[in-house]
Amino acid sequence: MMWSNFFMQEEDRRRTAVGRRRAQEQQNLGLTPEREGKIKLGLLVAIVGATLAVLAVGTEFWVELNTYKTNGSAVCEAAHLGLWKVCIKRLWQADVPAGRETCGPAELPGEANCTYFKFFTTGENARIFQRTTKKEVNLAAAVIAVLGLTAMALGCLCVIMVLSKGAESLLRLGAVCFGLSGLLLFVSLEVFRHSVGALLQGVNPETPPAPRLAYEYSWSLGCGVGAGLILLLGGVCFLLLTLPSWPWRSLCPKWGGPTA
């Protein structure tokens, strides 16, 4: 009985020592429950931006190209494209809204022909409605978008390491990665906008003549804009968490507590 009590006391002492050591490590790392909650909230914001970014880059509804409706024809053509592929659809004019002068929107049911851009493999330009893409601009937009996704993934990894390993020094790096990813997405959107302008001007001097086109940006590009804004917001939030608390206490004594 005496030996059993002795072993039980030793086990309690060991557990107490382990608990104190873990608490000391947590205190040394600076990850208080309140701070950990703020980091998790910032990570949640960044995950929303990451989801929108992947959705934008992976879909092909960045811009819609619509031909004008013609009298005496039952069908009309519209196209929608993104960073990787283009889809040309033949739509029934009866399905097009009556007050609309152009064919579309591209979400209407119809016969679709989707192809990936060949300038990623063979280096050939694509032809859309007797117009030729400018592959250098399209390639630049796609590469910049991929770099943005890479920076976003590195930012997520840094924040996860902060939460799991307590490596709080990586929080600043994560903030920079998220901010950089948001900026790269905006640059990719701007480069893509220039590629659309180059496509509309790249008319081939061939017969039959190229049809008149109207264009409108679609929901994939909207997701990209939202992703860039949210990722920038996440980067700013993480950057604020890396700043020391004493400047905020001096600027806002009511919020930061009493100052001596």
From Swiss-Prot:
Localization annotation: Cell membrane
Transmembrane segments: 43-63, 143-163, 169-189, 221-241
Membrane-related topology note: Multi-pass membrane protein
Annotated keywords: Calcium, Calcium channel, Calcium transport, Cell membrane, Ion channel, Ion transport, Membrane, Transmembrane, Transmembrane helix, Transport, Voltage-gated channel
GO cellular component: L-type voltage-gated calcium channel complex
Expression by tissue: Detected in brain and heart (at protein level).
Cystines in this chain: none
A GO molecular-function annotation: calcium channel activity
Subunit structure as annotated in this protein's UniProt entry: Interacts with CACNA1C. Identified in a complex with the L-type calcium channel subunits CACNA1C, CACNA2D1 and either CACNB1 or CACNB2.
Family: Belongs to the PMP-22/EMP/MP20 family. CACNG subfamily.
Function, in words: Regulates the activity of L-type calcium channels that contain CACNA1C as pore-forming subunit.
Protein name (record): Voltage-dependent calcium channel gamma-6 subunit
Gene assigned in the entry: Cacng6
